[in-house]
Amino acid sequence: LLKSKENFISPEVQTQNNKKIRFNETLPSIDNSILDGHFETARALEIAAAGKHNFLLVGPPGCGKTLLSTTLIPALTPNMTEEESNVNYRIKSLAGLTGPHQDKYTAPFRMPHQTASIEGMCGGGVNCRPGEISLATNGTLFLDETAEFRSSVLQMLRVPLESKSVTLSRAGRSTVYPANFQLGLATNPCPCGNFHSESRVCLCSAKSIEQYWNKFSAPLLDRVEIKHFVKKDTEDTRKITVDEMKSHIETAIKIQRERGVYNSKLNPLEIAELCKLNKTCQKYMDTITQKNDLSPRNVANILKVSLTIANMDGREKIRINDLKEANELCSNVFEKPNQYKYNFESSIENDENEVQEPIRLYSAKYQKELS
């Protein structure tokens, strides 16, 4: 199994035209009441699961970020394909984690402790065993209380998030393991946890808050598409159920598996081909790109998330509301534009009659700066 990279690295997603999308049926049923007042957070996690996008949830202690993440993501992540399952089985075999009663197709949800070392996360040791990032392949690596992890561990994630693999070297031998995972982060907004709280006073200085967030680094946060501040809004009457979210995700995953690649894994050329915009959408992207000084990676994140939103609605074409919601989700968690609120009626807005054009201005930058 260790002879070559090809023993592990397989196509991003097995093309499936007729196979039904299934979810983990062994989990206990979820009480939809936990979503009351958390429509925005549920929507963010729904989109993250539908496109396998990396996500960051920020909020004060007790706001529900960990509960919602650990409850919804395992329930909303579709089961693996046969090919994905085979890759995971090989990894688990080398880690000594296989057993006769394990569900072969359930996507992994790994939640390492905050004291995890680089070796524990990346893998290594005498026999070059796979680490958490490899064990989470085709599933989710969730880091609760992210700020408590060592800075070196967090920075180590940057390369695997790009390459989808990790190379371990020991005693003159190199071993390549896959590390194709969805990254989920959850953290307090500051050391005391009350920054941006509407009901509590933050006791942290500006310097301590800056030092707190320096641990994450801009390059790491740039690789996280969805960023959301969690707070319970008792006045928000919008409702959504887990079954409705699964239906939306099933629609999106089917489109992506037929295409052969998940939206979060699209490369610059694929983004330019799939994310064709009409004049209204192009003008909107031009405006926010210039106004917010967006980098090519920021633009790519918005386009990938907007494509996922369109796919959840059964569409391949991106509409203006898809871009607005994606821009809201991809913005800095403390600098949200707060100009768009998703509702089922506004998502029906029809601008499909306009001619779709390949994205301009951005594709050349993608190829140069993201390749």
Where are these regions (language model features)?
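Basic, amphipathic alpha-helical bundle interface domains used for macromolecular binding and assembly
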Residues: 127-128, 151-340
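Conserved alpha-helical scaffold flanking the Walker A/P-loop in AAA+ ATPase domains
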Residues: 46, 108, 119-141, 174
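Peripheral, non-AAA+ core regions of ATP-driven protein-machinery
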Residues: 1-50, 54-55, 63, 67, ...
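Walker B catalytic acidic pair
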Residues: 138, 144-146, 156
